[in-house]
Amino acid sequence: MKDVKIDRKNFIPHKTTAISKEYTLGKQLGTGAFGAVRLAVHKATKQTRAVKILKKTKENVQWILDEIHILSTLSHPNIMQIFEVFEDQTNYYIVSEQCKGGELFDVISEKGGFTEKDAATVMKQLLSGVCYSHQNQIVHRDLKPENILMDNKSNDLTIKIIDWGCAQTLKKDEKLHSTDGTAYYIAPEVLKGD
């Protein structure tokens, strides 16, 4: 008997029906370089979700599909999970879990910093998520406090790594040859090409 492997991406539907048939879109939660994120309520279950809306262009379709593929592959408690994807003539809609605690950057700013214990709690989760993605040959390439969301507003400091748009899948021993990410956060050795 052959081993049976369950592949998570087989359970992430990619639909070409209108998102409005299944979700009521609400307020805008944030914007980025390539799109916006809005609150959404699933009509049948009343569960709240976040929807990343990305405009289709010739230049970015493959980039969006790569991000969808990567997010469909990863399943880790500290990586934002997606549930389904919708596509219409002009946009892709990536439906994900909603993180209600805001960006790590804002939480650090509001608190005026973290205690060593709180910093260790966040770093342990961050490293766990990054190690998991690396074990799956996926490199995020844009880790920064703005791409780490707090799952909720409680003091447990549970984080989710988001925005895998710059991520890349690598084969064993393959090296990256391009510089991606947010310039302000890029390590000097990456800028030098080391």
List the predicted regions and their residue ranges:
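A short, aromatic-enriched beta-strand patch in the conserved N-lobe beta-sheet
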Residues: 84-85
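Protein kinase catalytic-loop region centered on the HRD/HxD motif
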Residues: 128-138
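Activation segment signature within eukaryotic-like protein kinase domains
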Residues: 122-123
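Protein kinase glycine-rich loop
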Residues: 26-33, 37
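Conserved activation segment of eukaryotic-like protein kinases, specifically the C-terminal portion
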Residues: 177-190
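Conserved N-lobe beta3->alphaC-helix segment of eukaryotic protein kinase catalytic domains
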Residues: 48, 53-75
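Conserved short submotifs of the Hanks-type protein kinase catalytic core
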Residues: 89-103, 107
